[in-house]
Amino acid sequence: MRNSKLPLYIHISLYAVTMFLVLWCMWYFCYHYSLLWLEGFSYFSTLPDVLSLSVVLPEGILDYAGAFLLQFYYYPIVGAALQALYAVVVMLCAMVMVMRLFDNPSHLLWFAALPVPFFVEGQYWNYTLTRSLTWIIVSVVIAVVVYLLTIRNRRRLHLPAFIANVAVEIVALVAIMGFTVYNLGYKDNSCREYEHIWKMEHLAETRQWDALLDITSPDEAQVNGFVRRYALLALLEKGKLADGMFLYNVTSANDFWFKDREEPMCRNYNAMLFRSLGVPNEVIHNTFQQQLQSNFGTSFAVLRRLAETNLETKNYALAKKYMDILSHSTVMSCWVEDRKPQLEAIRNVKPKVEVNGEQFKTSDLLEVTSEIFNLHPENRKCADIVLCGLLAEKNCKDFYLAFKVIADKQYAHSESIPRYYQEALMLLSVNTPGVLDGYSIDSDVRSEFQDVKKLVKNGEKDRVKSLYPNTFWAYYF
């Protein structure tokens, strides 16, 4: 019986399909949210003035081509396919060289896979795709040159039989695949750390607060400022900030936001915090600051938020402006069409304008939220930020002054007072018994506080933290 041998084109196809599937799975399942972030950080438009401003010959052409491709990352399944395809194209170009240079190339195709691990090693950090496109262009040029040089001279290199055999091919291919997976997914731990940040960012953007709390554990929050802040944002949204924030290593009011940090991810978080607090002007301010950090002058994430914020505030002119800008991209035109009914509904509506007054100084979050509460006393989230911020600063005196004002607005009808506020009032009552008048304190809080007083009196403050870990008392002492 004769040995069956696969045709060369099937051999090549198997290599390409296998490499594509492995890389697609890596990107889609390991870096799903990074793909979404890449799209949000990019910007592409068909407007001629954008093209003239963006493209500086010759390097600008690659930026523009990369921006065109990145817009399709809005769909992670497509983004993962494109990321995998770039590596496959590099490998196919190398296969052309193998077929033109070597005798019996069928079992030497693994040579063509050798560049792939080095290609994917730096692929994650290539925000503009210029590196990937450069690799592809260089690979195509080299493949064409080799093809042209071997048209007349068809003399091929002959390698020893022990190299050009199936066993060596399989072992080499498995090793190359393993090296590729390692370089892309495991060599650089910061890739997975940023993937976690982008996942938290996406869940917060889409208001999936329970899912966000599921991936922001108190243990991680001890060492990771992003995890801490996103967990606090989720607690704020769910009305549980004053029942659980001290589990997440809060040490000051600045743990609720990013102060004096200009990175896009920090500005983006601040914008979402102010969105939760109902302060559209600060959402827009932080979004514009985020825009300044974009490699493209603006970004899809920025434009979408500006459009949505102005839709929420019923500012027809500005909402239409940003939606018109987005409509000139290939993918976002569908996003715009979905929101046109919402836009038309506010055409003749007077925009919501924030009350005129002293300009907020966003260098101090507690001042900002205090001012907002004065304007909107029904805003529970602002009240929680003020009170929890003062507790984080261990400023019990100002906490009580603020609580008296806030309680008259939000706890005047026998509403349950959050746990940390009760604990702070009990602590204040030691020197000022009257602070408890008119407030309902749970019996278990009263009972536990008696134990805490005994421990403190006996000089056993350290035991307070071990016996009552998630309490204001443990934090205070």
Question: Where do the PLM segments sit?
Answer:
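N-terminal membrane topogenic signal
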Residues: 2-19, 102-106
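Soluble catalytic regions of membrane-associated enzymes that act on cell-envelope
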Residues: 186-353, 357, 374-375, 379-393
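Membrane-interface helix caps and helix-loop-helix hairpins in membrane proteins
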Residues: 121-131
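Membrane-interface coil-to-helix junctions
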Residues: 26-69, 73-78
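Transmembrane signal-anchor helices characteristic of membrane glycosylation enzymes that use polyprenol
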Residues: 12-36, 176-183
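Transmembrane-helix motifs of polytopic, lipid-linked glycan transferases
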Residues: 84-102, 117-119, 143-147
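Transmembrane and membrane-interface helices of multi-pass
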Residues: 108-121
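Internal/C-terminal transmembrane anchor helices
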Residues: 162-187
